[in-house]
Amino acid sequence: VAGARGGGAGGGADAAAVLVGLNALYGAKLSMSELCALGAGIGADVPFALMGGTCRVQGVGDLLKALPPVPDCWFTVVMPDYGVSTPEAFAAYDTVGSSTHPDCEAQEKAIRAGDLDAVCAAAGNALEECSGAKDNEAIKTLPRAHGAVTALMTGSGAAVFGVFRDEAAARAAAAAAKRQWPQVYVAQPDRGGARVIR
C-alpha cells in the first residue's frame, strides 16, 4: 500500500506474487514451505508476503509462526512525499540502536486473546528512531486526533499507520491527512498472503 521506500514490503509483496504466479503458471506444485525458502533468498519480507495473515516473524524474516487473525480493525496509512532507504535505516540502527523494544510475547498473547488495545500497547518499531523519517511525529498526531488506538511507522519507513476500531474513524483520519500528505490509504488486515485470483 505505501509505495516505494514506504516500509510496507511492496517489493517483497511483488516478489511473492511472482513466485505464486509462476508456481501456478508452470504447475510446479511447490508447497508453501518451498516457496518461502525460495522467497527468503530474494528478500527478508518475501516469506511473510507469501504466507500473509497474522504471523510472528523471527530470524531475518524466514521463521514464521502463524497466529490467529488480529482483532478486527482498520488502518489509515499515510505516505509522506519522501521515502526511506531500507539498507540505510538498518545501517543507522546497527550504528546507534534504539530504545524501543516491542514486547513480542505480550503482543502474541494479546493477539491470541483478541484484545486490540493490548496488541497496540505492545507494538513498537525499533527502526523508527533511526530511520531519518522526519515527519513521523507530526503525521502520527493526525490518526491519534481521530481516535487511533496507536500510530506507528511502517517497517523501515517512511509511511505511518494508525490503527482504528472502526471504518468511520479511519476514513475521517484519512480525509484529514489528505489535506497535507500526497498518499493516504484506508485498509483492513488481510487474512492471507499472495494468491492467484481467477
What are these regions (language model features)?
Residues 8-34, 48-52:
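DPxDG-like acidic metal-binding loop motif
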Residues 161-163:
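Short hydrophobic/aromatic beta-strand micro-patches
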Residues 21-38, 166-179:
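Phosphate-handling active-site elements
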Residues 1-7, 149-151, 184:
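Short pre-catalytic strand/loop immediately N-terminal to key active-site residues, enriched for Gly-Thr
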Residues 57-150, 165-171, 175-178, 182, ...:
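Conserved, helical-rich catalytic subdomain that frames metal- and/or nucleotide-binding sites
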Residues 3, 10, 154-158:
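Glycine-rich beta-strand-to-loop/alpha-helix junction loops that act as flexible
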